[in-house]
Curated annotation (Swiss-Prot):
Alphabetical UniProt keywords: Lipid-binding, Peroxisome
Domain (SCP2): residue spans on this chain: 14-119
Known function: Is involved in beta-oxidation of long-chain fatty acids. Its exact function is unknown, but possesses a nonspecific lipid-transfer activity, despite the absence of a cysteine residue thought to be essential for the activity of its mammalian counterparts.
Renumbered residue ranges of the record's region Hydrophilic: 43-52
Residue ranges of the region described as Hydrophobic: 33-41
Record protein name field: Oleate-induced peroxisomal protein POX18
Induction (UniProt): By alkanes or fatty acids; repressed by glucose.
Localization in the cell: Peroxisome
Single GO MF descriptor: lipid binding
Length: 127
């Protein structure tokens, strides 16, 4: 199942994350580290909203949501462009939150784990 959505700059990142979680050892490591279901809801420049569910509680999977976002342990709500910056370590999640660009619903501590997940599953070479 594809996790990419036309019109969202974050689509390639979700594809990389999905492929990274296909590695069972990486998925198990992420589940151990996070132990939460994270719902990520993004809004693109056209104002369209799309959600993805990152299940790091049991399955270690990522899925695109069709329709309303389900309830998870934590929900991150932000603009598509800000999520791309967050995933690429160009901006800190705390800074986005403090500036009102990131809304968090649910377990705030679990929300901080998302940055570590991207670092662990990043396929790009470490310099």
């Amino acid at each position: 199942m594809s996790v990419e959505v036309d019109g969202f700059n974050a689509s390639p990142l979700f594809k990389e994350l999905h492929e990274g979680l296909a590695d069972k050892s990486k998925a198990e490591e992420a589940v151990k580290a996070v132990n939460a279901v994270i719902v990520i809801t993004l809004k693109n420049k056209e104002g369209k909203e799309q959600s993805w569910v990152l299940d790091l509680k049991k399955a270690g999977t990522l899925a695109k949501v069709d329709g309303a976002a389900p309830k998870g342990d934590v929900q991150l709500i932000l603009k598509d462009v800000d999520f791309v910056k967050l995933a690429n370590n160009k901006v800190n999640g705390q800074k986005l939150f403090m500036n009102g660009k990131l809304k968090v619903k649910g377990n705030m501590m679990k929300a901080t784990a998302i940055e570590s997940v991207f670092k662990k599953l990043d396929p790009r070479p470490k310099l």
